[in-house]
Every structure is written in structure tokens, then in C-alpha cells.
Design a protein with these regions (language model features):
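Acidic/hydrophobic-patterned starts of short beta strands in beta-sheet-rich repeat architectures
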Residues: 50-61, 110-112
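Beta-propeller blade termini
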Residues: 39-52, 100-109
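Surface-exposed loop and turn segments in beta-propeller and other repeat-based domains
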Residues: 19-38, 93-95
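Beta-propeller fold detector
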Residues: 86-94, 136
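Repetitive beta-architecture junctions, highlighting loop-to-beta-strand starts
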Residues: 72-75, 122
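Acidic, small-residue rich beta-repeat scaffolds with periodic aromatic anchors
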Residues: 1-25, 98-136
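Beta-propeller blade signature
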Residues: 74-81, 128-129
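Short glycine/acidic-enriched loop and turn motifs that connect beta-strands
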Residues: 63-67, 117-120
Length: 136
């Protein structure tokens, strides 16, 4: 995995994604969001990348519980078969309820999440990418 300047075009706001919190279920976004029970799922970010030298993308969704509690982000890595996104790996990561901002980025071999907390240093979480594209 490596960062890239641009990513292949895809309709990220209107597609079906894996939901790693629901035992293999999926969630379908329409215009960038979906309602699952009382929860809301939103497209948060898309990051251009390359995987094994080919175009790829990292997509981040945020699931906000309707009954309160901390949100969870799903980070998913896609490669492309021609112009079609093919999912490789997905991971669910809880959001720190005290974070005022979250920024995702791609570095060689990993996806990074930087959380900004008031009065504290930023917290950086690193999610490694295995050879098959799954996330560690």
C-alpha cells in the first residue's frame, strides 16, 4: 500500500459496503448515507492509494449509534478490476468520544488515523495492510 495523487473514479456515495460490526452483513449507502436500525452510517472520506503498484482507494464510513454512545468508523481498502472497485479488507475502529477531529491518511504499508483531542497531543493509530489487502 502506498499513497497516490488521484484515485480511479467510483460512485462511493452510492454503493454497498461490508459492515464488520454486523457479522458479515452489509450496508448500502444512497447519496452518502444509510440508516441501519436506529444508527446512521455516513461516507466520511475517500483516499487515493496504490496496492501492489495498481490503483486503489481507502474508504472511511462512520456509524453513529442512534441510541447514543461512541461512533465507530469502518475503514475499507479497495483495488480496481478495470473500473470496478473490489473490496480487499475492512476493519471497524471505535472513535474516541473526546476527539474533536479525525484525519485519515495513507503511508507506505499502512493507513493512519489521527485523532485530535482537546488539551492533549494528537493520537495516531496505524492499521497495517497485509499482503492480501486485509487490514491488521
Amino acid at each position: 500500500l502506498a499513497p497516490a495523487a488521484t484515485t480511479a473514479a467510483a460512485d462511493w456515495a452510492n454503493r454497498t459496503y461490508a459492515d464488520p460490526t454486523a457479522g458479515g452483513a452489509s450496508v448500502t449507502l444512497i447519496n452518502g448515507s444509510a440508516t441501519v436500525g436506529t444508527d446512521r452510517v455516513d461516507l466520511t472520506d475517500t483516499l487515493p492509494a496504490t496496492f501492489r503498484g495498481e490503483p486503489a482507494a481507502v474508504v472511511v464510513l462512520t456509524r453513529t449509534p442512534g441510541n447514543g454512545g461512541p461512533a465507530t468508523q469502518f475503514v475499507e481498502l479497495f483495488r480496481f478490476d478495470a473500473a470496478t472497485p473490489v473490496p480487499l479488507g475492512v476493519k471497524a475502529v471505535p472513535l474516541d468520544p473526546g476527539a474533536t477531529a479525525t484525519k485519515w491518511s495513507v503511508e507506505p504499508g499502512a493507513i493512519l488515523r489521527t485523532a485530535t483531542l482537546p488539551g492533549a497531543p494528537d493520537v495516531v493509530s496505524r492499521y497495517g495492510v497485509k499482503a492480501d489487502g486485509s487490514l491488521a
